[in-house]
Every structure is written in C-alpha cells, then in structure tokens.
Amino acid sequence: MANELTWHDVLAEEKQQPYFLNTLQTVASERQSGVTIYPPQKDVFNAFRFTELGDVKVVILGQDPYHGPGQAHGLAFSVRPGIATPPSLLNMYKELENTIPGFTRPNHGYLESWARQGVLLLNTVLTVRAGQAHSHASLGWETFTDKVISLINQHREGVVFLLWGSHAQKKGAIIDKQRHHVLKAPHPSPLSAHRGFFGCNHFVLANQWLEQHGETPIDWMPVLPAESE
C-alpha cells in the first residue's frame, strides 16, 4: 500500500471540532425524540468503513441520502439488497450497459462491491429526515465532507473524481487537477441524464486512467456479498 494513512489519522482532529460535535448531537437528539433519520446510526459513516483512505481510487459524490424506508445505508447512490433500484442508479446502469462490454444490469442496487474496490461513494450530507429531502443540509455535514475532499486531494495522487451535476462540481472545485483526474457530467437523475450523462463514458475513462497509472481497474458489475445471495 503506497499510502498507509487512515481516515482516523486525518479526520480525528476534525471530529473534535465544535461544529462536528454539534452535528452529531443534533442528529442524535432528533433520533431520541422519535424522528426517523436515514441511514441508521450504524451506517452513517459506511463510505469510510468500506473504502479506507489509502485505498481510494475513484470518488463519486452524491448529495443527500435516500429518504425512503430501508434505502440509505451510507454509500452514495446505493440501496440495500431487496430494495428497488432508484432512478439515478438505473441510469448509471444504463450508461454502464452502453459502454462496458458484457455489463448486464443487476437486479439490485447494492454497491458495496464498488466501495470494496476503492470507489468512495460519498454523499455530501450524511443524514436526512424520513421523507424530507435536504432536511439536514445545513447541519454541518457539508463542512465535514469539504474537509474529506480536501484531505483526499492533499494526501492522495491520481484519484479519479466523477462529478455529476452542479452541486458535485462546485463541491469538487478545490481538487488539484494536476494531481488528480476530474471528470464532469450532468447528474444521472431522470431530470438531467439526457443532457449529457448518457454518453459521458465516465466508467470507461476512469478505468483507462487507472490502468495507465498502474492501478487495477474497477469491476463495475455490482456483486452481492455471498451471505446476501
């Protein structure tokens, strides 16, 4: 492993900042008062659990966790096995079908196998109230995930950032394009996918970049863990 720094090494100080402690306290208070918050507490930081800092090859930025029952589990765009694949992820699968030879759309939307290969699936806000999109957008999560992006930018080299939609592109404005590979396209949402997400070829381009820099390409076919099959 070329880079042995862990998320704990680089984020321990940030997690003691007053704003971050306040964010955690606000979320905990809402849960304790009976408000349903997604994802479940144990899953809020799954993006970091499944993809260690030294293993990050690709970053895909989402925005808000899914706010429907049983959907969000801490990985952007991903849903738990047994939950219907959401429209944006279906459009990601469609782009994969059109560009990756042999890719066949899976019957689930669980992307842990991407995360285990080094794809950091990072929502920029890490919690949401049930049924209320963007309800936690101003709690401080954006400050925290800005820091995460700046730490990847600083401590890693040659990471591919896939920035889909204006929110992700603004969020990624700090990335040093001399050190990293930044690809931009419209969001895969049904509202914007036809404006240039389809045909962006990002999954192919990401793998080409990784191979050119001596990294193993990503197998974009999502595979369920053996125990879920």
Curated annotation (Swiss-Prot):
Keywords: Cytoplasm, DNA damage, DNA repair, Hydrolase
E.C. numbers: 3.2.2.27
GO molecular function: uracil DNA N-glycosylase activity
Origin superkingdom: Bacteria
GO cellular component: cytoplasm
Sequence similarity: Belongs to the uracil-DNA glycosylase (UDG) superfamily. UNG family.
Subunit structure comment from the entry: Monomer.
Listed name of the protein: Uracil-DNA glycosylase
Organism: Escherichia coli O157:H7
Gene this protein is translated from: ung
